C-alpha cells in the first residue's frame, strides 16, 4: 500500500519543530535573525517560558526602562499585543518609572557587578528619559503618537513572515530609538566598579539601519533613527546617505536573503537539529557578547551539538 505523501504544510511543521521546544516557529524577527544561526538555535530552540527565565545584564533593562517610561508619558496609543491597545493609563512620572523598574527587579542580577550596575543606572535612566522625551516630542509635534504597533512583512518565497513592533509612529513618520546605556568598568586592583556615560555613534550602525529598513518597508513612512544617552541625542534622517530609500531597501533585501537561506537549510534538515547545527558555523565562545552569560541549558546544548565545552 502506497503511503500518503506529506503535504507541504506538514513538511514545514516537521522542519520547524526544532524551535520553541517542538512547538514550531510562527515568525521571524529582526532580533532573532541579526545574529549567527548558531546563536539563534541555542536561544529559539527552547520554549519561550524558558527563555524568559534566563538572566540578562543591565543594558537591555536600561533600554526598556527608558523607552517604556517615555512611551507611557507621551503616547496616545500603546499596543500591548497585535490586537489589544491602550489609550488610558496613569501618566504620573514616578508611577510609570517605578512600574518599569519593578518589572526589571523581578529577576535577580547576574552577579555582584550587575547588581551594582542595576542600582547605579537609575540616575542615568532619569536623565536619558528626559533627553528621549524631548527629542521624540519635538519630532512628532501635534501628530497622534502610536507606540509598539505590530507590523508584518513577507517576501518572495519566504515560509515565515518577519514581524516587529515600531517604537514610535505617527501618520507620516516613525522613529527607531536606540538607547546607549552607561558603561561599567572595574576599579583597578579592587572589587569595585564605576559607571560612566556611553558616547553616541557619529554614524548609524548597520544592524540598526537594517532594523530601520524593515520598519520602512512595512510602513513606507519617513524614517528616523535616533540614538540617545543620558546627556544628548543624535538623529539620522533621510538626509544621511545611509538612510536613503535605496540603501534601506538594499539592507532589507539582504536580511530577506539571509532568512531565505536559513529556511532552505531548515527544510533540508527535516527537523533534525543536530544536522542543522553541522551546517552552520559553530559558536565563537570568545565573541564579546553573543555567547556571554549563557544559561546552563544553552551550555549543555552547545556541547551536545558542537562538542564545545564552556569554560
Predicted regions and their residues:
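Short amphipathic alpha-helical face segments that pack within enzyme cores
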Residues: 65-68, 210-218
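Metal-dependent nuclease catalytic regions and adjoining charged, substrate-binding loops involved
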Residues: 204, 217-311
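Short acidic (Asp/Glu) and glycine-rich catalytic loops that position anionic groups and cofactors
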Residues: 44-49, 179, 231-236
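A structural signal for short, well-ordered beta-strand segments and their strand-loop junctions
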Residues: 146, 169, 173-177, 223-227
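Non-catalytic protein-protein interaction segments used by genome-maintenance enzymes to assemble
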Residues: 151-211
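Short loop/turn segments at secondary-structure transitions that flank enzyme active sites
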Residues: 72, 76, 181-183, 229-232
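Generic recognition of stable, solvent-exposed alpha-helical segments in well-folded globular domains
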Residues: 61, 65, 207-210, 257
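Metal-dependent nuclease catalytic cores that hydrolyze phosphodiester bonds in DNA/RNA
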Residues: 1-165
Amino acid at each position: 500500500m502506497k503511503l500518503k505523501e506529506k503535504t507541504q504544510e506538514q513538511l514545514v511543521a516537521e522542519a520547524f519543530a526544532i524551535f520553541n521546544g517542538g512547538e514550531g516557529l510562527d515568525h521571524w524577527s529582526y532580533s532573532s535573525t541579526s545574529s549567527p544561526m548558531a546563536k539563534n538555535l541555542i536561544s529559539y530552540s527552547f520554549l519561550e517560558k524558558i527563555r524568559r527565565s534566563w538572566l540578562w545584564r543591565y543594558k537591555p533593562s536600561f533600554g526598556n526602562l527608558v523607552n517604556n517610561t517615555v512611551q507611557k508619558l507621551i503616547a496616545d496609543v500603546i499596543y500591548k499585543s497585535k490586537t489589544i491597545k491602550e489609550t488610558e493609563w496613569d501618566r504620573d512620572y514616578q508611577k510609570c518609572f517605578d512600574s518599569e523598574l519593578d518589572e526589571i527587579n523581578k529577576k535577580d542580577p547576574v552577579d555582584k557587578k550587575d547588581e551594582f550596575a542595576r542600582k547605579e543606572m537609575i540616575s542615568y535612566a532619569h536623565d536619558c528619559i528626559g533627553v528621549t522625551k524631548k527629542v521624540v516630542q519635538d519630532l512628532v509635534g501635534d501628530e497622534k503618537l502610536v507606540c509598539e504597533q505590530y507590523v508584518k512583512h513577507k517576501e518572495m518565497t519566504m515560509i515565515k513572515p518577519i514581524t516587529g513592533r515600531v517604537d514610535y509612529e505617527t501618520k507620516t513618520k516613525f522613529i527607531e530609538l536606540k538607547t546607549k546605556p552607561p558603561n561599567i568598568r572595574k576599579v583597578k586592583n579592587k572589587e569595585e566598579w564605576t559607571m560612566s556615560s556611553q558616547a553616541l555613534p557619529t554614524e548609524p550602525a548597520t544592524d540598526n539601519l537594517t532594523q530601520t529598513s524593515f520598519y520602512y518597508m512595512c510602513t513606507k513612512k519617513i524614517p528616523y533613527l535616533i540614538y540617545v544617552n543620558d546627556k544628548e541625542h543624535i538623529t539620522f534622517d533621510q538626509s544621511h546617505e545611509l538612510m536613503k530609500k535605496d540603501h534601506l531597501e538594499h539592507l532589507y533585501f539582504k536580511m530577506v536573503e539571509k532568512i531565505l537561506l536559513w529556511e532552505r537549510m531548515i527544510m533540508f534538515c527535516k527537523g533534525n537539529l543536530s544536522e542543522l547545527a553541522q551546517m552552520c558555523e559553530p559558536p565563537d565562545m570568545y565573541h564579546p557578547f553573543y555567547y556571554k552569560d549563557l544559561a546552563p541549558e544553552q551550555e549543555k546544548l552547545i556541547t551536545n551539538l558542537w562538542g564545545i565545552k564552556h569554560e
